[in-house]
Design a protein with these regions (language model features):
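Lipid deacylating catalytic domains
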Residues: 2-250
Length: 250
């Protein structure tokens, strides 16, 4: 299946309201330690969209004793804070110690995992990929409650950005942006999220901020305007983030 057809296939989640679904993948090696990596997808998709990233991380030597979690939630009709609370409630039903957990969120999922922290869920590190911490680019439509909750004017994002639990945990936040260069030059956005928004420039001090670069031989508008954002779901395009997460697992 081509990348474009794969993207169109991912839009199946737009028209229906998905229930919370959480699946854990047992570690490659048995251990008495409790170490978890929870990966949360972005808008208009489900956990399958992040399996490439999960599989890449799972095969790292230092990940052999880590338990990975795939999360699916509704991104269309449910504001992300409500989804975060539902995910936390579901995880609390599991008989696991989550005190040593890495939270990874792609796009909208980055706000979901931050909201999980705001709700009191523990983490040793939080990684966001192409997340609109200060809203998406202004030309992206936000027609339903899910994407509207991401807007820079959303009360949900304003509340999250001043939440005491979120503020206290920012020394564990690792924020990644994607920018790209095509025939029209360098663009400081990924087609959906600006570099400053993905890096959470208004959040103050965080553990680290990183920018990843993509290069195109043709104008991105000849493909899809948000193609760079979408390509951040493919491990080969975000190797700096993969390596960084690997170090966090050591």
């Amino acid at each position: 299946m081509s990348h474009f057809r794969s993207y169109l296939h991912s839009l199946r989640a737009v028209t229906g309201k998905a229930a919370i679904n959480i699946v854990d993948i047992v570690p490659r090696e048995e251990t008495t330690e409790h170490r978890h990596c929870i990966i949360v997808h972005g808008w208009a998709s489900d956990a399958r969209a992040m399996r490439r990233v999960r599989d890449e991380l799972k095969e790292l030597p230092q990940a052999r004793t880590w338990r990975f979690w795939d999360v699916t939630y509704d991104t269309t009709w449910t504001p992300y804070p409500e989804s975060a609370r539902q995910i936390v409630a579901e995880l609390k039903k599991r008989e696991h110690d989550f005190s040593r957990t890495i939270l990874i969120g792609y796009s909208m999922g980055g706000l979901v995992v931050r909201q999980m922290v705001a709700e009191g869920f523990p983490c040793t590190a939080l990684v966001s990929l192409c997340t609109p911490h200060h809203g998406p680019v202004p030309w992206i439509p936000v027609p339903t409650r899910g994407p509207r909750s991401l807007a820079h004017w959303s009360r949900f994002t304003k509340d999250l950005n001043r939440n005491p639990n979120d503020i206290a945990a920012r020394d564990r936040y690792h924020l990644f942006a994607v920018v790209y260069r095509d025939r029209f030059g360098l663009h400081n956005n990924d087609g959906m999220v600006t570099q400053d928004s993905a890096l959470g420039k208004q959040l103050g001090e965080v553990a680290s901020r990183h920018t990843m670069h993509l290069k195109y031989n043709i104008p991105v508008t000849a493909l899809m305007p948000f193609d760079p954002h979408w390509r951040a779901m493919f491990p080969q395009n975000i190797q700096p983030a993969i390596r960084h997460i690997g170090k966090l697992m050591e």
